[in-house]
């Protein structure tokens, strides 16, 4: 190949190098997705942990509240038992609350002993506690002779020989009640229990309406059923037949069927008809209920002759039916008897 200048072969010009094409959005999203998922998982886990901690705290608070209520109930039962025991022994039931040193120093020992008319309960070997009108007086280093003098002065009760030497058996109980916040909690619990047990109200208006509609006799609920002779008269019709309609609260039945004229005693039961309830016999009522029409009396079978047995002088012999009772009456044609 020949060249125009004969020095070097022809080389085409190269343009500026183009930047590489940007990465597609899907690839970027693919790189970001794991990070987003990880952050979402961490946030969900943190939220679950926070919810679990909150539920755990609520459950712990509820259990603590229940335990406090149980403990208050036990303390109240023990307090009542101790009060009953002290009452039987002739000592008033009081809550022994020891006073601090300053308050005890300000009190006059003689004035406190003379003003106190409550119980005497030693808390320690040489400690005297007096309670009067809600105020508690505590005296330290009291000899048994002084306690004996106070008891004789107040109620004439002698001191037991071993009272000064031994400690009281109710010391743990009184020690537990020495804390004011426990006493306050116990009082709040008593108030709450009193409202819970004795504050009864009608929760539903239906109960109130039913109670207002019911009959009363001297404030007591009474039955609406009749009593005595009134019940007997209402259960019996004017003709002596049982009036079952009055028993069931329904209108009384008719004395005979309004269609065929059969007596109410000769049918198993009276049924509803066009004239109202208990106006048709059993057969007519069934026809009316099933087909909506009254039965044809011309096709009805003849009524069987009833044989009436009469007892002669109580010997149990029944009289045989007569010929007239066995043979039915001859049929009439146009109001005249047919000739034989």
Swiss-Prot record:
It is found in: Nucleus. Its main location: nucleus. Residues 121-156 form the Tify domain. A zinc finger (GATA-type) spans 257-284. Residues 61-84 have a biased composition (Acidic residues). Residues 48-60 have a biased composition (Basic and acidic residues). Keywords: Activator, DNA-binding, Metal-binding, Nucleus, Transcription, Transcription regulation, Zinc, Zinc-finger. Residues 182-224 form the CCT domain. Residues 25-47 have a biased composition (Low complexity). Signal peptide: none annotated. GO terms for cellular component: nucleus. One of its GO terms (molecular function) is sequence-specific DNA binding. Residues 1-88, 215-253, 313-340 are annotated as: Disordered. Induction: By abscisic acid (ABA), and drought and salt stresses. Down-regulated by jasmonate and wounding. GO terms for biological process: regulation of DNA-templated transcription. Gene3D superfamilies: Erythroid Transcription Factor GATA-1, subunit A. Belongs to the type IV zinc-finger family. Class C subfamily. Transcriptional activator that specifically binds 5'-GATA-3' or 5'-GAT-3' motifs within gene promoters. This is GATA transcription factor 20.
